[in-house]
Amino acid sequence: VIIFSDDNSIFNINIENGIVITKDNHLSSEVLVYENLECIESSHPSPTEKSINAGERLINFIESAKNDDQFLILISGGGSSLVECLSDGVTLDELKQYTEHLLSNGYSISEINNFRKKISKIKGGKLSIFLNKRKTLALYISDVPEDKLSVIASGPLVKDDNIISDDAYDDFIKEKLLKIKTSICPPDDFFKKIENHIVAKIENAKRSCEKESISLGYKTFYHEKFIEGDVKDLSNYFSEFLDSCDK
């Protein structure tokens, strides 16, 4: 998240200050040279105390901005775990417990992120509350099927259009959803000054991997479909798929 003043072009901005939140051991030297950027390492794929701390520092950073400041924000896959601010009545231990349960029981990324939205004060469009209708340009690196903005990092800056019924979950998850008071997505006017653009997709990464693999001399097969599910099932699928490619 970067703050810049109203009198600067977005393509020639004078960065006032910013905050960078990424995975443990993933901060590059190119970022660390900027003294006006606060750099934070957090946890992925399961949230920890670092995720809660990152959420608090992000909110404090946004709320410290002046009313006429503008924001440039990059959101990528992994943000759901890296940054969190929990709804009242939800503890970090519970968040970790339920996240591990969802990850280990074959739930899709959409189903996992839908649950995360329900127990969060910033996911599912709710980070827009803290931006308080300031002008914002949000750029996305997508890691989800169909590149749905409401799914990438659990959609902190877009109105939630990916509502999944509680019936999609097992009793262990549904019991928790019944007990907590879930946060509500803000009204439409909170999103009017937020401009969203996808700048990179899974397809870009796949094509780059394909190109590099071919350049290294490997026999390469490009898989068109997005694959997700239980690793036990998928390992069998890929074994059969690769076997068929050789015939």
Region spans (language model):
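N-terminal loops that bind phosphate or other acidic moieties
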Residues: 1-247
